[in-house]
Every structure is written in structure tokens, then in C-alpha cells.
Amino acid sequence: MISNSDKISRKEEINELFEQLGQFLEQRVEALLIGGAVMLELGLKDATKDIDVVCRNEEDKDRLLAAAKALGFEIVGPEKRHERLGVKRLAVKGGRNLDIFAGRISYDFDLSEAMWQKATRIRAFGSLVIRDASMEDIFIMKLIANRPGDAPDCSNLVIAGLDFDAVYREIEAQYRKTGEAKEKIWINYIEEGIARLQDNDLTIPIGDKISL
């Protein structure tokens, strides 16, 4: 049963929410789970408030938002802490946030095919199919977002062990995409996030490569 706490501390609660969403969906929706919810599953985080899911298109995002609304979630605009992210509508209930993206995560940093294929686990909840993002892609997303709690999450991911070559490949591929310079501001967020980790005596092997 989903508790009334403003944070989720049991992975079963997340699965229950996905089961309920899947029951309300009239069409199949696939999404990438990328954030604290995956870290909770991996035992790298004690609790999470935000459940971050990235759909592949606007249509699937709208379907998922409609299912959340049918479950009693309120659909609201993003908060200040989401200002770096490409999320436009949140589903909120009991102090918890279901942050639903449609492809774009931050400016022109979006859900790549590589991120989709690197998913570590695929689960079906009725009409909702959830892929768990890799730790490396969660790390990148949290460096960019820099919401309260994201910095310690990044530290925990580094300590758990990351494939920094994979991290760099994804960052480089996203940065080299054709696009306006102003849409590449997310690379500055990553650089700042890495600097903060290094200031806390964590070794980030790709730090020099990211420095602009």
C-alpha cells in the first residue's frame, strides 16, 4: 500500500504506483526511469520524492499524465528546482512528484537511443513498460539537474562505481549534435557538478575532458 509520507522509501511503493498507472493506460506506453527511484531499487538511496520518467514522445507523456490524473494526482507546472530540466508538467500527490519528460531532458540533451538501449532492466506493469536507466545516465542527469539531494546522489553513484568511459561517450555524443550554442548550456551544468564532486575529494577521471 502506498504510504502517506512525502517520500517513498520502499521500492514496492514505486512498483505499486506503476501498476496503477498501467491499469489506467488505454495504450502501451514505454518510459525510461532515470533518477532516485532506480537508486532506491539498487540500495544506493534511502528515500526519494521525485520519480523521473522519460517518455519517447509527447503523445506517451500526455497518456501517462492522464493516467496519473485519473489516479488523483494534480497536474501542475514545474517548480524552480526544475528550471534546468525539460519537464513542463508534473503530477503531484501527497507531496510526491511524478516528473514526466517527453524526450528532452535539458535543452538539447535528450533521450538518446544509446540511453534507451543501456537500460539495465525492463519491467511491464499492464500497459506501462518501464526501463531502468543505467547508473551512468542517472549520474549525468543528476549532474545537470542539481536539485536538492542530487549532489549526494552523484557522490553515492561515484562511490558505487561508474563506467566513466560510458559517461563521457554519452556526453560527447550529445554535445556534438547539431544545434545552437545556447541549447548546449547543459554542458556547463555538468562541468559545475563535476567540480563540486572534486571539491569533496572524489576522483572524476573525465573531469579534465569536460572542462570547457
For each feature predicted by the language model, list its residue ranges:
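Compositionally biased terminal segments of proteins
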Residues: 1-212
